């Protein structure tokens, strides 16, 4: 540092930089050793050199804006210039150790004893019920409510979460760690970020399991309050892998009011009985009537499907399963997904937006525990 003859207080500059988080790691630049140099001119002009984890870091512009804004607020600063350099291999190794410790193999933090992250696997028995739309809107609503949220697009074959969240950036990799892109205040990972164009993914079960394991263990999620997983429809390999990798994950079952949809949704929820997972609740999407030109109500998908699923799963599992909410039909829910802008952010007071915010609030406030979990054991009498 070269303070020169100036009234600018270097301690205040360092304090200002301590408020700037790395956009991917979500921790202060000063804590991560990413401030290489601070040069203060007598005129009050300040140059800050920031160390990037990789040369092609996609967050360069964000860092420039955030550092400039923080330093410009210090008394006496007349101008701010942000320069960049790249970490050495040794510095990246130290960063990895700081974030992950000295463990030789990555571990899934959400599966470790003492993890306070609430994990919800969003499932449906069949496609076309709006499961992915529900997932991204719940995630965006929770983030808007102040929670730290991550989303795993676990629908490897039918990935759609990046588009629905408007994510086009590819993840940055640092010493074997994957830094998930961020959008709307949440972190997200998807196989779609690693495939060229709209290329299909043609994998067998073991490859699916490995991909999910990497998304959970190799991605640096930081300290999450909630992790949401958008599962593929049905009860196949991915559902089994999630139960193995994240035994504490709770199932969210999405259905429509339609009879055929809720019958299939019951099968998806009944998987919890075999995997000893808890069912967090049922969400009925595409709910409520629409009206014709004469004002007559039309139940496009019938009614009562969500409650029927909740009641059936309660009987099957022997636990309390509640209908968390009913999300009205709203074309803007689909339009928001196409545009990468969740409805809960654009119109949180709309019928669908308000319903999703209410469901998100219920899930975000739930305490973790063993209530409702089938432990897979049989009590025996004491001898």
Regions inferred by a protein language model and the residue ranges of each:
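Conserved catalytic-core segment of NTP-binding enzymes
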Residues: 67, 210, 218-221, 225-335
């Amino acid at each position: 540092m070269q303070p020169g003859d100036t009234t600018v207080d270097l301690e205040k500059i360092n304090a200002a930089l301590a408020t700037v988080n790395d956009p991917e790691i979500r921790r202060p630049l000063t804590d991560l050793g990413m401030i290489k140099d601070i040069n203060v001119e007598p005129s009050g002009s300040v140059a800050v050199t920031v160390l990037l984890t990789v040369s092609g870091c996609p967050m360069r512009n964000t860092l420039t804006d955030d550092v400039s804004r923080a330093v410009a607020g210090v008394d006496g600063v007349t101008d701010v210039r942000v320069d960049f350099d790249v970490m050495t291999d040794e510095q990246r190794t130290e960063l990895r150790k700081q974030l992950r410790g000295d463990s030789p193999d990555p571990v899934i933090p959400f599966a470790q004893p003492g993890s306070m992250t609430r994990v919800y696997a969003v499932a449906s028995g069949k496609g076309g019920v709006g499961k992915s739309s529900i997932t991204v809107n719940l995630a965006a609503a929770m983030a808007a409510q102040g929670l730290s949220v991550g989303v795993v697009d676990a629908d490897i074959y039918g990935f759609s979460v990046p588009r629905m969240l408007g994510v086009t950036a590819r993840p940055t990799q640092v010493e074997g760690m994957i830094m998930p892109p961020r959008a709307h205040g949440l972190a997200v990972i998807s196989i779609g970020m690693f495939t060229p164009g709209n290329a299909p993914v043609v994998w067998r079960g073991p490859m699916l399991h490995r991909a999910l394991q990497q998304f959970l263990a190799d991605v640096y999620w930081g300290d999450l309050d909630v992790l949401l997983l958008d599962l593929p429809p049905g009860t196949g390999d991915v559902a089994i892998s999630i139960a193995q990798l994240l035994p504490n994950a709770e199932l969210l079952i999405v259905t429509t009011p339609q009879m055929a949809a809720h019958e299939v949704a019951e099968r998806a929820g009944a998987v919890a009985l075999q995997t000893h997972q808890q069912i967090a609740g049922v969400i009925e999407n595409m709910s409520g009537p629409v009206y014709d030109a004469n004002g007559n109500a039309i139940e496009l998908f019938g009614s009562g499907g969500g409650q029927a699923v909740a009641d059936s799963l309660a009987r099957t599992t022997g636990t309390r399963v509640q209908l968390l909410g009913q999300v009205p039909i709203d074309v803007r829910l689909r339009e928001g997904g196409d545009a990468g802008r969740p409805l809960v952010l654009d119109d949180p007071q709309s019928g669908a937006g308000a319903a999703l915010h209410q469901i998100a609030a219920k899930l975000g406030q739930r305490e973790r525990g063993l209530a409702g979990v089938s432990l897979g054991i049989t009590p025996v009498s004491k001898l």
